[in-house]
Amino acid sequence: MPRQSRLKQVNSIVKKYVPKTEDIKNVGAEIAKISKLEDMTLNVLLFVDNHASNEASTVVRNLFMTSVPNVRLQICYFDNNDVNVDRSADMAVIIGCDTSSVVDLLFKIREMAVPCYIVFDGSTSSSVSSFLAEREIAGDYCILNPEEKESVAIMKKKLGTWIANVCVGKKFAFAAAFPFVARPLAMEIVHLTAIENTAVGIVPFLSKADFPIMLLNQLCMLGQIATVYGKKIDLNLLKEAAGVLVAAIFGKKVFKITNKIIPLPAFVISGVVALGTTEVIGRALVSYFEAGGDIDGVVELLKKTLEGSKVASAAVKPIASKIAATVRA
């Protein structure tokens, strides 16, 4: 088949499978709803064991210091469990040692149905694991050695991941208020989107619909990650991003045709269509926003990311501009 005829086929496939502007608008509306979740009121309890070191308590306290007006932070210092627990709290964190008073307080908080995480001070606690095992306590905790940077980083990641998983209804508000929650939440979004797109890509009866579904999922991922880092996405940016993203996920039909123009191994194409591309794009977005990237640079970031990946950009370029034009129409 002549080259021009093949490109005509590409154009017809693009028009058939690229999501409609209305679908992209719906994604934008969903992202706008998510953005509003950032303003939800947060009620956080912080219990500090008087036996814990100042270094450990300072490290954890500083994580929750914020100027965000919708956050209520209650800090209580304790020697025993004779403290008041606000049952309306969204979550609680205990900074403590391996003492019975910490365990008693944990049970008291759990009785109030308030999710609780314990940060044990490694400088004053001897053997936390055996301490908890003896009391048949299975729970969420980590050991912090406040003088070690790696230990502090691990604690932040574990605590941030815990908050994102436990405080599901308010996870975007937590990410907006406390930066250490942002990356774990963003990576969770990337992971879930990659899994969903992988499932879409391998279902046979979705062969005519998988392109727009995967594209819309990736656009939604982009919007959610941007929201996590306090960035606002508008419809025009979504359309522009769609033009870049669709060139990367066009595997089956389009690449079968373009592959006759510029040969590509089948395993490269299929690997990119689902898990690979979504992971690459998602991680690039997270790193970009973590470094303070602005929303205006997102489209250029996507272009560079896809060109530098194993997408085999040489095959994408002949149709990328046509795809982008179709999406904007």
What are the functions of these language-model segments?
Residues 3-78:
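Conserved G1/Walker A P-loop phosphate-binding module
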Residues 171-189:
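N-terminal targeting leaders of membrane proteins
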Residues 56, 76-77, 117, 124-172:
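Canonical P-loop GTPase G-domain recognition
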Residues 1-5, 62, 66-67, 82-86, ...:
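Low-complexity, polar/amphipathic intrinsically disordered segments that mediate membrane, lipid-surface
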Residues 269-329:
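Charge-biased C-terminal accessory regions appended to nucleic-acid-, cytoskeletal NTPase
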Residues 183-284:
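Membrane-inserting effector segments that mediate pore formation, membrane fusion
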Residues 170, 233, 289-292:
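Long, hydrophobic, amphipathic alpha-helical segments used as structural scaffolds
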Residues 34-38, 50, 57-71, 81-139:
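Conserved C-terminal guanine-recognition region of P-loop GTPase G domains, centered on the G4
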